[in-house]
Regions:
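A short glycine-rich, Lys/Arg-flanked "PGG" loop and its adjoining helix->strand segment in the class I
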Residues: 141-157
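A short SAM/SAH-binding and catalytic strip from SAM-dependent methyltransferases
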Residues: 126-139
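Class I SAM-dependent methyltransferase SAM/SAH-binding core
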Residues: 58-117
Length: 211
């Protein structure tokens, strides 16, 4: 099913600069977890097969954003041979990604690309990162299938997908509504929550869920 996602709004306002995304990322500093969100994501990966083979790992980062994931995990990736393609829908994100991955020891490519159009990346990658991006897709089912198509046929290849629970930041929205009756209540993240992902992803992937 195709949903009406306003891509022009996302490109020309929400992500034309990095400030809104960076503000949301800062919220994670208030987590109760002992390690940060981005470090926690890395800790869930099993990269032993790649390290054992000592082969180059080809990674596609879809909707790479500002590069904070890579900046936070710079040391975690230092013992791997990496060939990474970073993609995002706006120049602002790509430029910030370049800054935050400048010290990353890897072959790096930076490209403008949208999650709804991934055909050029088919069958190329060992790992696909898609962190908090699928809710921006117009056709979620098609985009999920396209993510899988981007993977190569190696036994160790995998796709890393993150999203939010439907309860995510509801308290913030409640405070906003109490302060301003015109506070926006529509949330694009609600188009692909954890609860929706639990139903959609198993149709395409063999799932290993981490909470």
């Amino acid at each position: 099913m195709t949903e009406n996602i306003n891509k022009e709004y996302l490109k020309e306002k929400q992500y034309k600069s990095t400030k809104y995304l960076e503000a949301r990322i800062k919220i994670h500093q208030f987590t109760k977890n002992k390690i940060g969100f981005h470090e926690w994501i890395f800790s869930q990966y099993d990269l032993s097969e790649f390290k054992k083979d000592n082969n180059e790992i080809r990674i596609l980062d879809i909707g790479c954003g500002t590069g904070v994931f890579w900046k936070k995990n710079l040391n975690n990736f230092q013992n791997y041979k990496l060939d990474i393609t970073f993609t995002d829908a706006t120049e602002a994100m790509i430029e910030k990604q370049k800054i935050n991955t400048a010290e990353l020891n890897a072959k790096k490519k930076y490209e403008i690309a949208d999650i709804d159009n991934l055909e050029k990346y088919k069958n190329q990658f060992d790992i696909v990162f898609c962190h908090n991006v699928i809710y921006h897709a117009g056709d979620k089912e098609k985009s999920i299938k396209n993510l899988k198509d981007c993977l190569n046929d190696k036994r160790s290849s995998f796709c890393s997908i993150t999203t939010n629970s439907e309860k995510h930041m509801l308290n913030v929205y409640e405070i906003g509504r109490n302060l301003d009756k015109n506070f926006p209540t529509d949330r694009i993240i609600d188009t692909f929550t954890e609860e929706i992902a639990d139903k959609m992803l198993p149709k395409v992937f063999k799932i290993e869920k981490k909470n």
